[in-house]
């Protein structure tokens, strides 16, 4: 199955794939004719980088259960090349405690505050419109078709027809009175 989508949103999820819990990203979008679709991407490990960590800190990181892998990298940081450590973890939720611990140790971190679904988009250099190829995936309870993507490639930009629902409630913070409730739907 092949589909070209205007990307609208993304979210990460943990799933059991080949007997192991792995993080995947679902990309949500619309085709040029207005059909909503979701795409499950191949698994990718969440990661961040530590600038010039001491050897004892590297050993402590590598011994932690939540760390999947580490590797040395040379990166341009603050105007010069520096030794860095790329740290891959098993789940996006493991980044925050590690980040906080490493910052408390006064280490400099890179890419440790990017939500994982955005990290996936940046790492794969995805634009606003992308063509996906893969097999249809049965997702119980989902209201749109889902593709289990095997390939992704940039696509020519297009504007997908969107239906926008806007809802607003204006109220008083003092006495909890509602001043105005508005709802509008726009088909585009």
Model-identified regions with their sequence ranges:
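The two-metal-ion catalytic cores of nucleic-acid processing enzymes
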Residues: 1-188
């Amino acid at each position: 199955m092949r589909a070209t989508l205007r990307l609208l949103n993304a979210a990460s999820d943990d799933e059991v794939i080949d007997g192991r819990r792995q993080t995947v990203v679902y990309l949500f979008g619309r085709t040029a004719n207005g059909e909503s679709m979701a795409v499950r991407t191949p698994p990718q490990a969440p990661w961040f980088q530590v600038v010039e960590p001491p050897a004892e800190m590297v050993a402590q990181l590598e011994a932690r259960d939540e760390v999947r892998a580490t590797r040395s990298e040379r990166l341009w940081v603050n105007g010069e090349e520096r030794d860095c450590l790329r740290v891959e973890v098993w789940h996006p939720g493991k980044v925050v405690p590690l980040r906080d611990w490493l910052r408390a140790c006064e280490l400099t971190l890179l890419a440790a505050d990017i939500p994982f679904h955005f990290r996936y988009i940046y790492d794969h250099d995805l634009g606003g419109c992308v063509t996906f190829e893969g097999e249809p995936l049965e997702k119980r309870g989902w209201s749109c078709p889902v593709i289990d993507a095997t390939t992704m490639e940039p696509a020519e930009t297009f504007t997908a027809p969107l239906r926008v629902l806007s809802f607003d409630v204006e109220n008083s913070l003092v006495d909890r009175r509602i001043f105005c409730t508005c709802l509008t739907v726009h088909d585009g």
